[in-house]
Design a protein with these regions (language model features):
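Pre-Walker A (Motif I) flank of P-loop NTPase domains
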Residues: 1-4
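Hydrophobic anchor at the beta1->P-loop junction of P-loop NTPases
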Residues: 7
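Walker A (P-loop) phosphate-binding loop of P-loop NTPases
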Residues: 12
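Conserved lysine of the Walker
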Residues: 15
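Conserved substrate/cofactor phosphate-moiety recognition/catalytic segment
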Residues: 23-64
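Glycine-rich phosphate-binding loop used to anchor ATP phosphates in small-molecule kinases
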Residues: 58-111, 126
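A glycine- and Lys/Arg-enriched "phosphate-lid" helix/loop adjacent to the NTP-binding pocket
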Residues: 96-163
Length: 182
């Protein structure tokens, strides 16, 4: 049984807040690699940033996602992922970037649990910060790109309702229990 549970959606939809709550509850979680790449690149004065070199940024995310998958699949326990390699494919579509065959192959080969939880755009909680420079319209387009990307790779999506963090966590855990994933 695949026990790697993915959260996806546009930026600023509450994925990371739910991940933080799951960590508090004792669950293993894989943090979002996009933010990690941005922080590293800013610290190094690098170019692999979404506002400098989108292809290099995507390629760095793919490398990190592969490492994440390899590390966390060995835990043999439930792990929640704040995005995964399929998001890199969706990002490529969103930004009209050329998609290398290696990325398509990796999305086919590196698998996560089905279903995937998708967080819809939620303007009331959307906010920019040092790493998130997109506006809400881009968040909506990102959400649509993720729907297409995950469907392309055969994942069922469960939309997480817009409600409190605790209610979202309970919603997710109940769906996983219903499917006997926990």
């Amino acid at each position: 049984m695949n026990n790697l549970i993915v959260f996806t959606g546009g930026p600023g939809a509450g994925k990371t807040s739910v991940i933080e709550k799951l960590i508090e509850l004792g669950y293993a979680c894989a943090p979002e690699v996009g933010r990690k790449v941005i922080k590293q690149q800013v610290a190094l004065d690098g170019d692999a940033l979404p506002w400098k070199d989108k292809i290099a940024f995507r390629d760095e995310m793919v490398r990190e996602e592969k490492k994440h998958h390899q590390t966390f699949e060995q835990l043999n326990e439930l792990v929640f992922f704040d995005r995964c390699i399929v998001d890199s494919y969706g990002y490529s579509q969103l930004e009209n970037l050329p998609i290398p065959q290696a990325l398509m192959d990796a999305c086919q080969r590196i698998r996560y649990a089905n279903p995937v939880f998708i967080f819809p755009p939620w303007e009331a909680i959307f906010a920019n910060d040092e790493e998130r420079k997109q506006d809400f319209a881009v968040a909506v387009r990102t959400y649509q790109a993720m729907i297409e990307a995950y469907h392309q790779y055969g994942y069922e999506l469960i939309e997480v309702p817009t409600m409190s963090i605790e209610q979202r966590v309970n919603f997710i855990l109940e769906r996983l229990k219903d499917r006997q994933l926990i």
